[in-house]
Amino acid sequence: MAEHGKLARLRDLLWQMEVEVGLERLSQPQRDVYYAACLVADADKVLHSEQVRHHPMVETMARPTFYRALKDLVQEGYLVSASEIKNGRYKIAR
């Protein structure tokens, strides 16, 4: 099988998994920010937005797009603020 065929199958598998957990309705920037957040979160699922911002998956994303996606993820309940003050700390909620 050609490499592009393998990649297509892998992408199809990822899409199926996203559908199972409800991520398919997120925009691509929202998904990328969510995945990067999951990758940089500590054992308690806590992360700082700057850690996410500098992850290779999203570091080339425009700042407004990144922060809009982050805000949307909070509004949708995927992330919650980990502090009562605005300090950039979030916790993965689902």
Model-derived features: positions:
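Alpha-helix N-cap/helix-initiation sites
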Residues: 23-27, 45-46, 59, 63
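Short, cationic-aromatic polyanion-contact patches
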Residues: 84-94
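Short alpha-helical segments that sit at the start of domains
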Residues: 4-40
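Short glycine/proline-centered loop/turn elements that form peptide/ligand docking sites
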Residues: 49-50, 67-68, 88
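Long, compositionally biased intrinsically disordered regions
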Residues: 1-4, 44
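Short acidic, hydrophobic short linear motifs in intrinsically disordered regions
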Residues: 43-57
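A short, conserved structural fragment
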Residues: 74-84
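Short amphipathic alpha-helical interaction segments
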Residues: 60-75
